[in-house]
């Protein structure tokens, strides 16, 4: 049996976009820093990294669709932080952002990763943005790097 999997490497020519929500920017700024760090550590060229900022997580699928339709990116890393409040708003935003990103990924058949935190508390979000639980932005970018390499090999 032949095993096909992506490697954690870039050759410097890959063009990548990070699409991040500004809402909860105290968290998303850290996620972006982690994603950028992963991109550069694994051979990415900073000139080939674009940061697209949208108002909130609900707008991520729109920007993702626009970025992928332009056909200039090898992959896109989506980042956001949705923190539960006292109303059902969290459930709607989390569900629609997730569904929109998944549907857009399948529509364009390009590597996309989901680095959108969905947490019950701000403390949980902080833990996942570079504190106790690592940086999920870094993890989302390393996943994207592997997918880009896998995409080239399939």
Swiss-Prot record:
Domain of life: Bacteria
Job description of the protein: Catalyzes the formation of 6,7-dimethyl-8-ribityllumazine by condensation of 5-amino-6-(D-ribitylamino)uracil with 3,4-dihydroxy-2-butanone 4-phosphate. This is the penultimate step in the biosynthesis of riboflavin.
Any Pfam family: DMRL_synthase
Keyword field: Riboflavin biosynthesis, Transferase
Residues binding 5-amino-6-(D-ribitylamino)uracil: 23, 57-59, 81-83, 114
Reactions catalysed according to its record: (2S)-2-hydroxy-3-oxobutyl phosphate + 5-amino-6-(D-ribitylamino)uracil = 6,7-dimethyl-8-(1-D-ribityl)lumazine + phosphate + 2 H2O + H(+)
Any one GO biological process: riboflavin biosynthetic process
Residues annotated as binding (2S)-2-hydroxy-3-oxobutyl phosphate: 86-87, 128
Family assignment from sequence similarity: Belongs to the DMRL synthase family.
EC number: 2.5.1.78
Source organism of the structure: Nitratiruptor sp. (strain SB155-2)
Disulfide bond entries: none
Protein name stated in the entry: 6,7-dimethyl-8-ribityllumazine synthase
């Amino acid at each position: 049996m032949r095993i096909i999997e992506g490697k954690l490497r870039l050759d410097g020519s890959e063009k990548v976009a990070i699409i991040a929500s500004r809402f909860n920017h105290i968290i998303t700024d850290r996620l972006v820093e982690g994603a950028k760090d992963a991109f550069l550590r694994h051979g990415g060229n900073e000139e080939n990294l674009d940061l697209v900022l949208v108002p909130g997580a609900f707008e991520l699928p729109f920007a993702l669709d626009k970025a992928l339709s332009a056909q200039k990116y090898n992959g896109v890393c989506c980042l956001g932080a949705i923190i539960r409040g006292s109303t059902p708003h969290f459930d709607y935003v989390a569900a629609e952002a997730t569904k929109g990103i998944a549907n857009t990924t399948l529509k364009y058949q390009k590597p996309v990763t989901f680095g959108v935190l969905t947490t019950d508390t701000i403390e949980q979000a902080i833990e996942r943005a570079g504190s106790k639980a690592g940086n999920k932005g870094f993890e989302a970018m390393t996943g994207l790097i592997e997918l880009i390499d896998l995409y080239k090999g399939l």
